[in-house]
């Protein structure tokens, strides 16, 4: 019986030792879990901060994305004001027209600088992706569905349609009532 009790005490000692080891492992794992949770919370705060910073930066870019373009247009505005002032005093219409042509040329250069260009449509087949047909012109001088007149120019900004052109499109002439077809 003594042997049994010694064996039991030995087993009990081993179990206590094992229990202590397991408690230490649990303690370590709890510490790791706590540190991991702290790190996750820290990373979440960092992500939230970066999201907010990105949102602010994007808003700032939206607000000022046309700043350079607007600055370049100020020179055109100044020239228009000078032309208007000169026009009020000038007697010579040709010099006023020349000033307006210079301003128009300057404006086209600024548009070109920013990737804004006219959509060439006149004389071409009507394309609803770049133009709106606002008039029909009966004619046999052009094939049907050909743009015969640009009413308002259309523009691209890079490869995207900024504003579609408004155009008149050729349609075949209608036969007059009472005319016989022979």
Swiss-Prot record:
Participates actively in the response to hyperosmotic and heat shock by preventing the aggregation of stress-denatured proteins, in association with DnaK and GrpE. It is the nucleotide exchange factor for DnaK and may function as a thermosensor. Unfolded proteins bind initially to DnaJ; upon interaction with the DnaJ-bound protein, DnaK hydrolyzes its bound ATP, resulting in the formation of a stable complex. GrpE releases ADP from DnaK; ATP binding to DnaK triggers the release of the substrate protein, thus completing the reaction cycle. Belongs to the GrpE family. The gene is grpE. PANTHER family: GRPE PROTEIN, GRPE PROTEIN HOMOLOG, MITOCHONDRIAL. HAMAP family: GrpE (MF_01151). GO terms for cellular component: cytoplasm. GO terms for molecular function: adenyl-nucleotide exchange factor activity; protein homodimerization activity; protein-folding chaperone binding; unfolded protein binding. GO terms for biological process: protein folding. SUPFAM superfamilies: Coiled-coil domain of nucleotide exchange factor GrpE, Head domain of nucleotide exchange factor GrpE. This is Protein GrpE. It is found in: Cytoplasm. Homodimer. Keywords: Chaperone, Cytoplasm, Stress response. PROSITE patterns: GRPE (PS01071).
